[in-house]
Amino acid sequence: MSNAAAPATEGPDRSDAPAHVAIIMDGNGRWAAARGLPRAEGHRRGVEALRRVVRASHELGIRYLTIFSFSSENWSRPASEIGDLFGLLRRFIRNDLASLHRDGVKVRIIGERDGLESDICALLNEAEELTRDNSRLTLVVAFNYGSRQEIAKAAQKLAREVAEGRRDPATIDAETLGAHLDAPDIPDPDLIIRTSGEQRLSNFLMWQAAYSELVFVPIHWPDFDKAALEGAIAEFARRERRFGGLVAKTAS
């Protein structure tokens, strides 16, 4: 994308917003079924919702937005649906990457790339390379991602270091393992949102979600918009985050 304009670098100061929001974008198929439409149309409308939420995240002062784009378990879906999802990813990167770059969005990809089609890998690499110096909003795309697989891969890296004599196993702790995950430089999510009313993480950021606030909203992903995001943030703001401890009492 050599014709992309120079990106913006700073976002608004909104101290009330969570720094990192992660979203499980669920309900595209059910949204389509409720309207008598093919599942592919639900996924297409889901991409439109993603555009809205990326824009809203910047406007609300969110610094990191992680989206669960394609789970490692999604390979069990019909081949035609997988083809539709990959086609949407191709079009999204080709059509939206220049505008994301212009708006100062940095794209990061987490997940397993081995086994993906070569053109998909090339597009993912292009998105990261073009936007690597942007700082207004970091969009983390979890693609072909599974949290258990991510943790297992981190354990394998540590095991190799021990086997090669580069690490004493006694030095391995939670911080060490966390540093071997896919994106250790990105802070853990403050808020995880799941659409469609389902109340589970589905193998998404299970390590990073240790102290995240979880908000489950009943609407399907294609209907999610800035107002819905603001509602989830308002619920987040009402929570008392304890991080395993007690909330300090104010003096009366």
UniProtKB/Swiss-Prot annotation:
Annotated CDD domains: Cis_IPPS
Superkingdom of this protein's organism: Bacteria
Subunit note: Homodimer.
Key words of the record: Magnesium, Metal-binding, Transferase
SUPFAM superfamilies found in the cross-reference section: Undecaprenyl diphosphate synthase
EC number: 2.5.1.-
Record carries keyword Heme: no
Gene Ontology CC terms: cytosol
Cofactor, how bound (note): Binds 2 magnesium ions per subunit.
Pfam families the UniProt entry points to: Prenyltransf (PF01255)
GO biological process, alphabetically ordered: polyprenol biosynthetic process
Gene source species: Bradyrhizobium diazoefficiens (strain JCM 10833 / BCRC 13528 / IAM 13628 / NBRC 14792 / USDA 110)
Binding-site positions, Mg(2+): 26, 213
Gene behind the chain: uppS2
Stored Gene3D superfamilies: Decaprenyl diphosphate synthase-like
Cofactor(s) listed in the protein's UniProt record: Mg(2+)
Biological function: Catalyzes the condensation of isopentenyl diphosphate (IPP) with allylic pyrophosphates generating different type of terpenoids.
Gene Ontology molecular function terms on file: ditrans,polycis-undecaprenyl-diphosphate synthase [(2E,6E)-farnesyl-diphosphate specific] activity; magnesium ion binding
Family: Belongs to the UPP synthase family.
Binding site for substrate: 27-31, 39, 43, 71-73, 75, 77, 194, 200-202
Record keyword Metal-binding present: yes
Entry protein name: Isoprenyl transferase 2
Active-site residues, as the UniProt record annotates them: 26, 74
